[in-house]
A protein has these predicted regions:
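Generic hydrophobic/packing signal
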Residues: 17-19, 29-31, 200-203
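C-terminal partner/receptor-binding element of secreted or periplasmic proteins
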Residues: 174-209
Length: 209
């Protein structure tokens, strides 16, 4: 616990001291799309522990303002996205994949050609099927999806955020084939992959930057 707190404090201090990195908060998809958020200061980014993920689920990062409790509350419940220097994070509380919510806190974003991709826990039938443990019980419906997803709290897949609708779509094999259509060599390499996990998908998304 002390070690985790120390690391978090060091991370916060690094953000503050790194040339006063630009920190911008966005309250909705329109502001993010247009790049017209509000500039703030003294934000702190903490990587959430595996224990925290198992207890409450949600995104990998916690963003708060240690010197401003009301701002911290806003960041948690109402803020849509946060940009700190070149790093962008979206609030999982505001994200939706079909009818499923993605929990709280923040997910890191990979920006590729004006598109926004972020990593989060696999939820729903389309996402969980790709990562469900081999021995997981196969159940039907939402209950089955929830049970399967609960065993995947430390797993990540990519979602693509549509800022016009505010909806997210799972980035699976079919979507990656569309994105790689203009890169035949990359597409051939991708077709050999057997996983849709974030580490695999992300490898090819980064090559499109």
């Amino acid at each position: 616990m002390k070690k985790t707190l120390f690391i978090s404090l060091v991370f916060c201090l690094a953000i503050v001291q790194a040339g006063r990195a630009q920190q911008i908060i966005y309250s909705n998809p329109d502001e993010l799309a247009e790049g017209r958020g509000d500039t703030v200061s003294t934000l702190c980014v903490e990587r959430r522990t595996l224990n925290q993920l198992y207890l409450t689920g949600g995104g990998d990062y916690r963003i708060l303002s240690p010197q401003n409790r009301s701002l911290s509350r806003y960041l948690r419940k109402r803020c849509y996205a946060v940009r700190i220097d070149t790093a962008l994070y979206v609030n999982c509380r505001k994200m939706r994949y079909k009818k499923f919510r993605l929990g709280g806190w923040y997910a890191p974003v990979l920006e590729v050609g004006g598109r926004i991709f972020y990593t989060a826990q696999p939820v729903g039938q389309a996402a969980t099927e790709t990562l469900t443990p081999t021995n997981a019980q196969k159940l039907r419906g939402e209950v089955g999806d929830a049970i399967q997803a609960s065993g995947l709290v430390d797993q990540r897949v990519y979602y693509e955020l549509d800022l016009e609708t505010g909806h997210s779509n799972f980035v699976g094999k079919e979507r990656m084939r569309e994105l790689l259509a203009g890169k035949p060599e990359l597409l051939t390499e991708f077709e050999k992959e057997t996983s849709e996990a974030a580490e695999v998908t992300g490898k090819y998304l980064r090559k499109l930057k």
